[in-house]
Amino acid sequence: LDPAGPAGTYNDGGQLNGEFEGGPVQKADFQELTGRFGFDWKLGDFGPTDDTMLYAFISRGYKGGGINPPQSAGLVTVKNTFDPEFINAFEVGTKSTLFGGAGQMNLAAFYYDYKGYQISSIVNRSSINENVDAKVAGFEAEFYWQMTNNFRVDTTLGLLSAKLKDQSLLDTYDQTGGDPNWLIVKDAATTQNCVASAAGVQALLAATAGTALEGTPALICNPTALNATLATYLGQATADALTPALAPNGIPTDVSDNFLPRAPETTLSVGAQYEMELGKNWSTILRGDFYYQADMYSRIFNLEADKIDSWQNANASLSFSNEGAGLEVELYVKNLLEDDQITSQYLTDASSGLYTNVFLLEPRQFGIRIGKTW
């Protein structure tokens, strides 16, 4: 570039000449009144145990919206701002002391009504936020029992139903929405995909008699650049009443009643430990833990590619401690079952090839920890 170019241009050394004029300043203001109302009641003689508490709460929650990263012209349209998230939450439960104080049981049921639930996706290599409406209902149970002076068990159970309400959204992984009348075309200039009518594209290819038509994908994906010939063929059909034969973003997919991301219907954990005195201020604890998680989806579109299979994990440890000396030694094993299960994943956008980045359970590990306190 010419080093003496106008203000706002770069020279060949990468230095900016003069002042750079950025785009318009984006502003957003969000505010809401929130609150929480509830009660708790110790049942006494009316409860299943002498120490049982019943509680119930109603609350109104709020999380402010924000501003999405700017997008280049000609790419998938993204709203400049995303809306606030609102939640009306209802919860009832009990807390009970069992076995004369040797045990504890907590039970809770809840229902969350979300308006504008904020979800993230990747567009043009940037993380953007969108809003959906959702309903979440669930049940949780916690149980602990010191069965003897040396042995205790604890367990938790979670049951969850987290689904979207009636709505349609654009899936960047399936921009045609499964409609065979539309094709995905990649614009080499922007590396983004767009959607054009199958009939229009086939007519265009037939009109060129198989010869190369330079810049065709870019022209298809940027309808304002279409010349008369291209417009004639691509204009044969429209998507969502858009012209020419183009739905730049794609065909929305019905996600009504789909599961929310990373919301398994069942989770379960079980743990047990045995503690024993060894003499001379030394004690030892042997502990084992097991965790199970049901199937879930990584995206709200609930495709087979979004599914994360159920998985389980087990850990074990053996520790020795001397309280008087402030010394502790622990031997442990993580991922005892040596399971290579995927625990989470996310999908990128078309500019990076729509690849999926996955996160695996860490491989089996053996280790020793030594601690000293003064």
Give the residues covered by each predicted segment.
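Short loop/turn motifs that connect adjacent beta-strands in outer-membrane beta-barrel proteins
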Residues: 44-52, 99-102, 150, 277-284, ...
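Signature of Gram-negative outer-membrane beta-barrel scaffolds
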Residues: 1-49
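Gram-negative outer-membrane beta-barrel transporters
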Residues: 111-113, 130-300, 371
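Membrane-embedded beta-barrel scaffold of Gram-negative outer-membrane proteins
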Residues: 42, 53-63, 81-168
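Transmembrane beta-strands of outer-membrane beta-barrel proteins
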Residues: 1, 35, 52-54, 103-107, ...
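C-terminal beta-signal and adjacent terminal beta-strands/loops
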Residues: 162, 289-299, 320-374
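Hydrophobic, lipid-facing positions within transmembrane beta-strands of outer-membrane proteins
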Residues: 33-39, 78, 88-92, 137-141, ...
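Transmembrane beta-strands of outer-membrane beta-barrel pores
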Residues: 58-64, 71, 98, 109-115, ...
